Design a protein with these regions (language model features):
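ATP phosphate-binding P-loop of adenylate-forming
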Residues: 127-133
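Domain-scale recognition of functional cores that engage charged ligands
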Residues: 100-126, 137-384, 396, 424
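Left-handed beta-helix
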Residues: 2-123, 281-518
Length: 518
């Protein structure tokens, strides 16, 4: 099979512009000079006009962005400016999602066992993985998708195996699309070369790149375009940018012309996000424009989006957006937690973007960069649920949400709790309770290198584990089994080495290896 994307002989991705928009246009290069007309930066000062006018003037005079991206950035800034004047959400209007918009996965009818029908369904599908993040939270400087998860296989390796299996099993050509950011694009282009001879087509494209905003002045941080200013003065504006980026890249039209009708979007680190034929059949049969998979929120789901009803429409609300005084009541009332597994009709997306009707809620995040407080304006892919007419929330089983955000999650997915079949993680039949154990590893385990050093013989047996907390300098031996609730705490300056063959059940282990009933 062939594949397209970044690299020699590939499609031009949206925002290869990372190179083209600063290398393919003339720039003034003298000191203190940037942008259209060679406007001296030192002479540019915000006026007393509105913050929007000042930002628009700065972006144009400094020539920071190409037209498409400039429009997108200024749209987000406009929404941000409005939110400063009045609350973005009238909390009195927030209601539970109407029952008619929610279907339980257990109530979804099975896809008929008809090979021709399944071929027809899968031939309409595109799989897209959000691949814009680095593995920095786990001490890695490369794309998170390249981290090895199971048996020397990375997130990307597992995804490729899943797609290859479907292609071979049903005689289809499901394209795999990777949405990269400027942080992951070049490395990903090199990584995917190893899949040249595999049975799938890979497309890559890159999302937008926006300038950080100085919080005190509400002016752009960079004084010249990307590539001519430090990379940390720029940021990818969230995965809600996917729709505009896919449209602008030309890939959306290309996929539609190939006869593709639905796109399945998910985070590359969610090992539970696989194509489910029953869900696909239900969505296609119901002519759904946009569907979001959600789970029942638990105490472990500390951040993310919640699906609610708002002024008669579905809406995705980030927990961080909820005022502190309302948070407890909000969590008690609303518990449909967004998995970021999304099914969307490609023609509906194309129509909404073309008509400029894909207006997504803005999330404001604050970051410290070089000692300066900055803002970044982001959107979420799931917030598009409010833009479509025929929408659906699918309350899915927890197995469809298995993200790896930390080494605690890595501990879980590398354990004997799961096996791998055709690139998909499958829970062990030895696990009687199908709930997932709660794993809390201390800071000593935070980075992958240290994590692996502390489990040199692999993750302990945890098929009967309910809860594990580890704090301090702890190293696990071979063939260790953890059952029930286990707490291991090494005091500062102490080392706990769990001996080979140890079985801990409902135990607390302290610095001197005393084992107590818990």
């Amino acid at each position: 099979m062939w594949y397209q994307g970044a690299g020699a002989g590939f499609d031009l991705p949206y925002q290869q512009n990372m190179d083209l928009h600063h290398g393919g246009r003339r720039r003034s290069s003298g000191p203190g000079i940037a942008g259209a007309g060679g406007v001296p930066l030192m002479h540019f000062q915000p006026t007393h006009a509105s913050v929007e006018d000042n930002m628009r003037e700065a972006v144009h005079m400094l020539d920071l962005l190409l037209p498409d991206q400039r429009k997108g950035f200024l749209r987000l800034f406009h929404q941000f400016a409005q939110q400063r004047q009045r609350p973005a959400i009238d909390w009195a209007q927030v209601k539970p999602l109407p029952p008619e918009l929610v279907v339980q996965q257990s109530d979804v009818p099975a896809c008929p066992n008809d090979q021709a029908l399944r071929h027809e369904l899968l031939d309409k599908v595109v799989i897209l993985k959000l691949n814009g993040g680095l593995g920095t939270t786990m001490g890695c400087v490369w794309p998170k998708s390249a981290i090895e998860v199971r048996s020397d296989l990375s997130f990307l390796d597992l995804t490729v195996r899943q797609v290859e299996y479907l292609n071979s099993m049903y005689g289809v050509d499901i394209p795999l699309v990777l949405l990269n950011s400027f942080k992951t694009h070049e490395v990903t282009a090199k990584i995917i070369r190893k899949y040249r001879m595999h049975n799938l087509t890979i497309h890559t494209f890159m999302q937008s790149c926006h300038p950080r905003i100085i919080k005190d002045t509400l002016q752009p941080m960079p004084s010249c375009p990307f590539g001519e200013s430090p990379p940390n003065e720029w940021y990818p504006p969230g995965h809600g940018d996917i729709y505009q980026a896919l449209y602008a890249s030309g890939l959306l039209e290309n996929l539609i012309n190939q006869g593709k009708e639905y796109i399945f979007i998910s985070n590359v680190d969610n090992l539970g996000a696989t194509v489910d034929l029953d869900l696909l059949y239900h969505i296609v049969d119901g002519e759904v424009d946009f569907a979001v998979e959600a789970i029942q929120r638990t105490r472990a789901d500390l951040s993310g989006g919640i699906l609610v009803g708002y002024k008669g429409k579905p809406k995705l609300v980030e927990l961080s957006m909820v005022p502190p005084e309302r948070r407890d009541d909000f969590k008690k009332t609303h518990n449909l937690f967004n998995t970021n597994n999304i099914w969307a009709n490609l023609r509906s997306v194309q129509r909404m973007v073309a008509k400029d009707e894909m207006s997504l809620d803005v999330t404001v995040r604050e970051r410290q960069v070089n000692g300066i407080r900055t803002l970044q304006l982001e959107t979420l892919a799931g917030s598009a649920v409010r833009c479509f007419d025929r929408v659906l929330a699918v309350a899915v089983e927890r197995a469809r949400y298995l993200p790896v955000k930390s080494t605690s999650d890595l501990f879980l997915v590398q354990s004997d709790l799961y096996g791998v079949r055709h690139g998909t993680l499958v829970m062990s039949k030895d696990r009687l309770d199908k709930s997932v154990p709660l794993i809390k590893l201390g800071r000593e385990f935070s980075f992958v290198e240290e994590f692996l050093r502390r489990i040199p013989h692999g993750v302990p047996n945890i098929t009967e584990l309910d809860h594990l907390t580890v704090a301090g300098d702890v190293i696990f031996g071979a063939n260790v089994s953890l059952k029930g609730t286990v707490i291991i705490v090494a005091n500062e300056g102490s080392v706990i080495m769990i001996p080979d063959g140890t079985v801990l059940r409902d135990s607390v282990v302290t610095g001197n290896l005393r084992i107590l009933d818990h």
